[in-house]
Amino acid sequence: MSKPKSETAPVAVNRRARFDYEIEETFEAGLMLMGSEVKSLREGRANIAESYVSAEREGLWLINADIPPYGPANRFNHEPKRHRKLLLKAKEIARLTGASTQQGRTIVALRLYFNGRGLAKLQIGLATGKKTVDKRQTIKDREWNKQKSRLMKNYG
């Protein structure tokens, strides 16, 4: 028997974002979705690996996120890669748009999940791009932690 999913189990995670960017601050944003998109998300079908957040038209928009069509919705289905509006407080939107205009800073999608009330939420992060040296250091740290855990398991 499979174990039950927790309420905040992620539907989609952008693992590449934490490797390519240094996340300075995270925010929780709501998503303006259609009904067929919500049903598709509840099935766990979404991909935010290549998505990003853009400040345009009086708000923040999630661009290039792939939510596949929901099968039973037939002709009333949504467009898989349409732009989706993010729901944040006005002060948060102003802060993020101001910060993202600075050189080298961007807003990335980190994970997509349902909160305790069953609402679809997107965790976004204000990020700065990492240089190649930083990425190599991240790989070294990860390998060292794996090696430490193996040593502790065998000799600990």
Curated annotation (Swiss-Prot):
The gene is smpB. Keywords: Cytoplasm, RNA-binding. CDD domains: SmpB. This is SsrA-binding protein. Its main location: cytoplasm. One of its GO terms (biological process) is trans-translation. Belongs to the SmpB family. One of its GO terms (cellular component) is cytosol. GO terms for molecular function: RNA binding. Required for rescue of stalled ribosomes mediated by trans-translation. Binds to transfer-messenger RNA (tmRNA), required for stable association of tmRNA with ribosomes. tmRNA and SmpB together mimic tRNA shape, replacing the anticodon stem-loop with SmpB. tmRNA is encoded by the ssrA gene; the 2 termini fold to resemble tRNA(Ala) and it encodes a 'tag peptide', a short internal open reading frame. During trans-translation Ala-aminoacylated tmRNA acts like a tRNA, entering the A-site of stalled ribosomes, displacing the stalled mRNA. InterPro entries: SmpB (IPR023620), SsrA-bd_prot (IPR000037), SsrA-bd_prot_CS (IPR020081). PROSITE patterns: SSRP (PS01317). SUPFAM superfamilies: Small protein B (SmpB). It comes from Maricaulis maris (strain MCS10) (Caulobacter maris). It is found in: Cytoplasm. Pfam families: SmpB. It comes from the Bacteria.
